[in-house]
Each structure stands twice: as C-alpha cells, then as structure tokens.
Design a protein with these regions (language model features):
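Local cysteine-cluster metal-coordination motifs and their immediate loop/turn environment
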Residues: 1-6
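C-terminal scaffold of the Radical SAM
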Residues: 7-31, 37-289
Length: 289
C-alpha cells in the first residue's frame, strides 16, 4: 500500500549509497542556483531513512548542514518508523539538526498492525513515541491509515483516541490504497486477510475523523493533515503545494525548479553511476505547462 521508493539493503549497500548521496550534495553546494537560495525546509523521505545506521545518519545530516544554505528557522523532517526509535539513533538525529519527525504508525491496534506487517505492538508504539516526545526537541507527527483490513469504525475511533492520548503534535490521515500485485492485495485475494473497507465506508471513516478532530481543537492544514500545536508547521508540505523551488537529492527524489519538474533515477545502480561520473542523476526532466 506504499508506492514510494523501496529497495532492499545491507550495511555495505547502505554505506555506498550514503557516500554517493553526500557526493551529490557536495557537488551541488557551489552551484549558483543553490548557493544563492535559502532553504526553508528539508524532507528526508523514503523508503525508511530512520533505518540508516547512526554513523550514516550522522554523516548525512552533517553534510546537509554543510552543503545547503539553511534558513535560521529551517524545518528538517526525518521520515521513519516506530521500530527505529531507540536512544542510539534518537541522540544522533536530534544532535544533528532534525527538528521534525514523521512516523508511520498506520494503526495503534496490535492485530491490525501485525496484519499489515508492522513489528511493534500498541504498548511499544506508545512507549517509543513517549521516548521521542520526552526529548522535547522536535515536532512529532504520525500517519494513520483508514480502511485497513479488519479495521471497523470502533477500531478507527480507538486509533483516534490514542492519537490524542499520545501527545504528538499532528497527524496525517490517509485512505488505504491496495495496489494490484502487492503483498496486501495477494493476502486479501488468498483469504489470509479480510477485505479492505469499501470507498464508501472509507468516506464515512474520514468524515468521522474530521468531526472528531475539529471538536478537539485540531487545525486542518491541508486535505489530510491536522495539527494540534503551533510547533507543527508542516512547512515542507506547505511550500511544496505552493510551487516553491524544490531541489532533489537522492535516488527517486523529485523536485521542481524554474519551470521544470525533475525526477532522479529510482534504481540504485544508475543513480550511483551518474553521481560517481560527476553528473546529476536525472531520470526525467519535464517542462511544466
């Protein structure tokens, strides 16, 4: 149910990829178009960047600080998963510029989570979120998905209740999409999981959540994102939707600049080949209409 960048890895592959990503950042650092800009938001998305080793995360974050002309009130989001919220990683992220965490909870309900391949039970999810919040050094937002197999309206309300109780600064509520050929689609087709909710039922779940959050003073920042504190600015998403210049770095990254939309190579091998040859690893460059 995720159509974003996905690749398997091991430590050697990870080390080499981060080497190339840093090389790409360093190669762009002195370009006039980037050097003369001010970067207000950095979004390290995925994939699952929190899976990086502490050493590689530190190297990457320090390269971002060195190579990009960051505004003094910049937002630096690290996207990730609950399972990675361990002290040896948290300490590195927060000491090296991360000031916003976006985490894929999907559901707090243990059985629902396990059905879609999530490792941690409800107690662990809440414990790890609390561990991050106790640092008091970044905005914390989570993703919840509605329409998951076995997730009825009662469980959905429990998810929303736990969202409030968790104390996070905001949340994205996403409708489940089941892609043809995906593991989730196969599990449903084979009877291993119950069907996902219908579109009509999902619409009811969204309407319920909208009313539920509005009654609890949550602010709706865009069609699917809510904030409950001034700490959560959702700056990257706001700027992206406003047509601001976006500089892409890393395999599969997309951007837009001076009337052109860009996509960097999604496959690791050509991405690394172009970077090591001293070239920007464009897969596509299209003039915006």
């Amino acid at each position: 149910y995720c159509g974003f960048f996905q690749n398997g890895t091991n430590q050697e592959v990870e080390d080499h990829y981060v080497d190339c990503l840093i090389q790409e950042l360093e190669a762009s650092a002195d370009s006039p178009r980037l050097k003369d800009s001010i970067i207000h938001a950095v979004f390290i998305g995925g994939g699952t960047p929190t899976s990086l080793s502490p050493q590689n995360a530190k190297r990457l974050l320090q390269a971002i600080q060195t190579c990009l002309p960051l505004a003094n009130d910049y937002e630096l989001t690290l996207e990730g998963r609950i399972h990675d919220l361990v002290p040896e990683k948290l300490d590195v992220w927060l000491a090296n510029g991360v000031n916003r965490m976006s985490l894929g909870v999907q559901s707090f309900h243990t059985d629902i989570r396990r059905a879609v391949g999530r490792l941690d039970d409800q107690e662990t999810v809440l414990h790890n979120l609390r561990s991050l919040l106790d640092y008091n050094q970044c905005a914390v937002v989570i993703d919840l998905i509605y329409g998951l197999p076995g997730q009825d309206m009662k469980i959905w309300q429990e998810d929303l209740d736990l969202l409030i109780q968790s104390g996070v600064d905001g949340a994205d509520l996403y409708q489940l999409n089941v892609f043809d050929g995906s593991d989730l689609n196969k599990a449903i087709a084979n009877g291993k999981l119950p069907p996902a909710a219908t579109t009509a039922y999902q619409a009811g779940m969204f309407a319920f959540a909208k009313e539920y959050l509005e009654k609890r003073a949550y602010r709706r920042l865009n069609i699917c994102h809510w904030s409950c504190s001034n700490r959560e600015r959702s700056l990257y998403n706001t700027l992206a939707r406003s047509g601001s210049a976006m500089f892409p770095f890393g395999s599969g990254a997309g951007g837009g600049l001076d009337g052109y939309s860009t996509m960097l190579h999604r496959a690791i091998q050509p991405y690394e080949m172009f970077v090591e040859a001293g070239k920007k690893p464009f897969m596509a460059l299209m003039k915006q209409s």
